[in-house]
């Protein structure tokens, strides 16, 4: 990892930006299927399908910001808007429940999360690549990918530990191996208690993610604005 890259102001912003964003994106969002299966009782297949709003948001934001960046020649606003969208998504996900209103909040929240991902990640990669010489493009792209993944690993471990601390001793661990079966527990009182513990534990994760999203917003506002490079590839060498 070329350390001289960290002398560049853009990289000093994009690296922590993608790391903190990755903490939320990979950490908090990994538990959405668990909530859908355990609390709402949907099948694993349907819990995967219910994540489509995230991918729809990613696609819309990625394509939209790409076109707008090309048209306007500036990229600075999109990570800020993406970070705000990510924070809104966390707020809405913290409200999700098995009620109709709670599921609506979750689905809309997933769209905002997707918009946040699409606004932050591709734009940070573009800004970083635009800030370095062509010979460092591969290295700097790897740096961004590494810190995004590192943030995800840390986030997944941290949110997993938080969830465990909330449910340890309150829910039989065997139930978590087949979360959909919780809805089939014959003892109504036990079932409601388990669902309440899981629901409160999972939504707590998104409440914790809200201040992290605010940190992402603050970092995004520090991103320097640089004119986009108007040429592609390495400069040609005259061999005559």
Where are these regions (language model features)?
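Transmembrane-helix exit segments and adjacent C-terminal regions of multi-pass membrane proteins
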Residues: 182-240
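12-transmembrane solute porter fold
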Residues: 1-169, 205-216
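Short, Lys/Arg-enriched, Gly/Pro-containing loop segments at transmembrane-helix junctions
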Residues: 1-4, 169-174, 227-237
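Juxtamembrane non-transmembrane "cap" segments at the membrane-aqueous interface
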Residues: 164-185
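Short coil/turn linker and secondary-structure boundary residues
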Residues: 1, 42, 177, 185-189
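N-proximal short alpha-helices
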Residues: 29, 51, 178, 187-191
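Short, surface-exposed, charge-dense and proline/glycine-enriched linear segments
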Residues: 78-80, 85, 171-172, 186-187, ...
């Amino acid at each position: 990892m070329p350390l001289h890259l960290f002398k560049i102001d853009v990289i000093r912003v994009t690296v922590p930006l993608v790391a903190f964003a990755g903490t939320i994106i990979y950490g908090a969002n990994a538990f959405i299927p668990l909530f859908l299966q355990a609390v709402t009782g949907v099948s694993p297949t349907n819990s995967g399908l219910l994540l489509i709003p995230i991918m729809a948001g990613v696609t819309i934001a990625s394509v939209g910001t790409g076109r707008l960046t090309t048209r306007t020649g500036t990229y600075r606003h999109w990570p800020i808007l993406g970070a705000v969208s990510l924070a809104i998504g966390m707020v809405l996900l913290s409200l999700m429940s098995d009620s109709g209103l709670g599921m609506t909040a979750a689905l809309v929240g997933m769209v905002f999360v997707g918009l946040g991902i699409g606004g932050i990640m591709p734009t940070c990669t573009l800004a970083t690549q635009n800030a370095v010489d062509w010979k460092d493009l591969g290295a700097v792209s790897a740096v961004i990918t590494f810190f995004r993944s590192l943030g995800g690993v840390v986030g997944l471990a941290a949110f997993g530990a938080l969830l465990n601390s909330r449910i340890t001793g309150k829910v039989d661990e065997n139930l978590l191996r087949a979360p959909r079966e919780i809805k089939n527990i014959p003892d109504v009182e036990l079932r409601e208690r388990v669902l309440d513990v899981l629901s409160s534990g999972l939504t707590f994760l998104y409440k914790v993610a809200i201040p992290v999203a605010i940190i992402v917003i603050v970092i995004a506002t520090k991103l320097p604005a640089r004119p986009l490079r108007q040429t592609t590839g390495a400069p040609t060498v005259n061999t005559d």
